[in-house]
Amino acid sequence: MSAESYLSRGVSPTKDDVKAAVKNQSKGVFPGAFCKLIEDLAGDPEYCTAIHADGAGTKSSVAYLMYKETGNYDWFKGLAQDSLVMNTDDLACCGVTEDLMLSNTIGRNAHRVDGKAIAKVIEGYDEIIGKLASQGINITMCGGETADVGDLVRTLIVDSTLVARAKRSEVINAANIKPGNVIVGLASFGQATYEDRYNS
């Protein structure tokens, strides 16, 4: 899709304005890392703290449309996985994969998204956390926020924030990537061993 097509839908393909807005912010203790890493919250100089936020984005609209077509609330469960893995994959790019703490935010239009849908999103978090635990990725759900923002949101927004401590010696710092290094990329489509169905 062309840049103009994105812009006509209210989406910035480059986010130049956002980059300009944050240009004077601290880059953290590893400025070249994929995510911002800051001083360790516990004050240990051998550790740092990773915090990352992302969400399911426009997949919320797809889940809502599928629910409206089928009447099946289970479509909302997948938003938890979409929101969570947008964070786990980014933190994994920094080498941060252990003992993650999760907080989430669900913003909804209560005229369209009822408590049953919210319950399914939360159930989805419980399910994906259990599946990831079976793969050695331990995440503790620490609660979150559910906001009724019908004046801002047409259906719902599902966002997650992950926090973890990491040993500085184990951080993957993208600033250290050099010519000749091998970068392995994994396709995001298909079906992982912990998934119930094909994932696009």
Protein language model features and the residues they cover:
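Helix-biased detector of long, well-ordered alpha-helical tracts
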Residues: M1-S200
